[in-house]
From Swiss-Prot:
Claim: Protein biosynthesis is one of the keywords in the record: no
Lineage: Bacteria, Pseudomonadati, Pseudomonadota, Gammaproteobacteria, Pseudomonadales
Record's keyword terms, sorted: Arsenical resistance, Cytoplasm, DNA-binding, Metal-binding, Metal-thiolate cluster, Transcription, Transcription regulation
Protein name: Arsenic resistance transcriptional regulator ArsR1
Biotech exploitation of the protein: Could be used to construct robust and highly sensitive arsenic biosensors.
Main location: cytoplasm
């Protein structure tokens, strides 16, 4: 098993196809990862609204994606935002963008709920 050091001394497995595909084999994790890849950055409340799932369920799935090294989070006030990890291999980034582009219809119910969400938190990445 190959590992790499992350800031703070944390060690993680290097993202291999089996790790990535195992994480994304779950419908909820696939939907949230693709929405994040599409939008750039989303907070927990936006994902809860878009996917129509409880906050604990969303947070549990986000933790798995973060621990795998696919996503990273940042806190701004009361909001926790998630985005693709900047050190995700290029092949993962390209694959996610390709899947988003090729599956707009599959993502459209979640994307529509997100677009219709009132009082979304302001994110510098989403507004850039």
């Amino acid at each position: 098993m190959a590992v790499r050091a992350f800031p703070g001394g944390h060690m993680r497995e290097i993202l291999t196809p089996p790790i990535v595909f195992k994480c994304l084999a779950d419908d909820t994790r696939a939907r949230m990862t693709l929405l994040i890849a599409r939008e750039g950055e989303l907070c927990v409340c936006e994902l809860t609204h878009a996917l129509e799932l409880s906050q604990p369920k969303i947070s549990r799935h986000l933790a798995q994606l973060r621990e795998a090294g696919i996503l990273m989070d940042r806190r701004k006030g009361q909001w926790v935002y998630y985005r693709l990890h900047p050190e995700v291999p290029q092949w993962v980034d390209a694959m996610l963008k390709g899947v988003v582009d090729a599956n707009q219809e599959w993502l459209s119910p979640d994307a529509l709920r997100l677009a219709e969400m009132g009082e979304r938190p302001q994110s510098p990445v989403a507004c850039a």
